[in-house]
């Protein structure tokens, strides 16, 4: 989000709600944890594969995620601060796996699916079976749809570059017509997506057209 200093140069914001997508990830993880417990499963330790902690979106995301899982059996035991992208997700997860020897990693939260995809690779190389030993939840849908379809990733949140672009154009048109925006902050939708809903997930764009998930996500979808 624009800070107070930047607002003198920016007439409005169009984009994702970091809090909402992290909250939705937390709710999905709660759902997965409840199902595991009901089936007699044990172990609810969570590894967070995060954005760099100096990045503004990190604080918004981790706090919303913690609020969403509060009161559940889930406990964060590690928070990776390696960087963006698959390579950093892999590197950070590998380091944390070594650092957490003796503790089980039962759930993984990825602040975006690119980071999570790298983390999943590191977990698998360490001998863990995704979807069985470890349950993974991500956000942003910039990873690989196949991970969800194969059950290696429980879910993600749908963040659509198409919606961000359409909303930005809509706000520019509004500003040119009226000289101001009705709302300075304008968020795009970030609904949850799981294996059960992935085939039927669709969103209506700001142009009124209906788009499927393969048109909306930016990863290997």
Describe each region flagged by the PLM.
Residues 1-20, 39-45, 141-154:
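Flexible loop/hinge segments that line or gate small-molecule binding clefts
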Residues 29-37, 97, 168, 172-180:
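Short, hydrophobic alpha-helical segments
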Residues 1-5, 19, 52-56, 82-87, ...:
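Solvent-exposed loop/turn segments at secondary-structure junctions
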Residues 18-21, 25, 29, 57-61, ...:
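Stable alpha-helical elements in mature extracytoplasmic
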Residues 1, 11-12, 45-49, 78-79, ...:
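Structural recognition of the beta-strand scaffold that forms the well-ordered cores
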Residues 64-65, 77-78, 82-147:
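Hydrophobic alpha-helical
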Residues 15-25, 44-69, 75, 81-87:
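Extracytoplasmic ligand-binding site segments that recognize negatively charged/polar headgroups
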Residues 43-53, 69, 160-221:
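Hinge/cleft segment of the Venus flytrap/periplasmic-binding protein
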């Amino acid at each position: 989000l624009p800070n107070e200093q930047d607002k003198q140069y920016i007439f409005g914001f169009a984009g994702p709600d970091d809090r909402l997508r992290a909250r939705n990830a937390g709710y999905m993880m709660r759902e997965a944890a409840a199902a595991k417990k009901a089936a007699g499963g044990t172990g609810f330790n969570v590894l967070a594969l995060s954005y760099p902690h100096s990045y503004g979106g990190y604080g918004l995301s981790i706090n919303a995620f913690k609020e969403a899982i509060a009161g559940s059996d889930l406990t964060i035991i590690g928070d990776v601060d390696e960087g963006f992208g698959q390579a950093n997700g892999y590197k950070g997860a590998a380091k944390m796996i070594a650092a957490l020897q003796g503790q089980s990693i039962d759930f993984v939260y990825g602040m975006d699916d690119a980071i999570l995809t790298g983390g999943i690779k590191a977990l698998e190389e360490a001998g863990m079976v995704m979807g069985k030993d470890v349950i993974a939840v991500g956000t942003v849908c910039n990873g690989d749809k196949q991970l969800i379809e194969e059950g290696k990733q429980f879910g993600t949140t749908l963040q659509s570059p198409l919606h961000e672009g359409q909303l930005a154009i809509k706000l520019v048109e509004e500003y040119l017509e009226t000289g101001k925006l009705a709302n300075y902050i304008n968020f795009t939708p970030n609904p949850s997506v799981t294996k059960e809903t992935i085939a039927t997930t669709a969103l209506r764009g700001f142009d009124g057209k209906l788009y499927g998930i393969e048109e909306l996500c930016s990863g290997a979808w």
